[in-house]
Amino acid sequence: MLEMNNGRRIDLLLITSTQAKAIRRKQADKKLTAKQASDEIGITQVTYRKLRDGGEVKPIIYQKAMQWLAEDY
């Protein structure tokens, strides 16, 4: 999917159900609230909901989420 930003095209990336499950599992393993998890990732709670539930996000959000998942492993 595409999103326009100041006339520029941005390709959105899909958080798959498997990735969303991994995000939820890490949140649970660390005993974090959604607010705490979103703060650790560096995103808003609304954006975190998209990650947790699976959905399309901007590349920078995807990158932050994948970096967060890879931490501690």
Say what each PLM segment does.
Residues 17-21, 42, 59:
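Amphipathic alpha-helical repeat elements characteristic of tetratricopeptide repeat
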Residues 23, 34, 62:
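Helix-turn-helix DNA-binding elements, focusing on the entry/boundary residues of the two helices
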Residues 4-29:
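A short, Lys/Arg-rich alpha-helix, primarily the initiator
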Residues 31-49:
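Short alpha-helical DNA-recognition segment
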Residues 54-67:
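Short, basic-rich loop-to-helix N-cap that marks the start of a DNA-contacting helix
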Residues 6, 70-73:
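Short C-terminal boundary/hinge segments that cap the last helix of small helical domains
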Residues 1:
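General nucleic-acid-binding
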Residues 29-32, 57:
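Alpha-helical structural elements of signaling/regulatory helical domains
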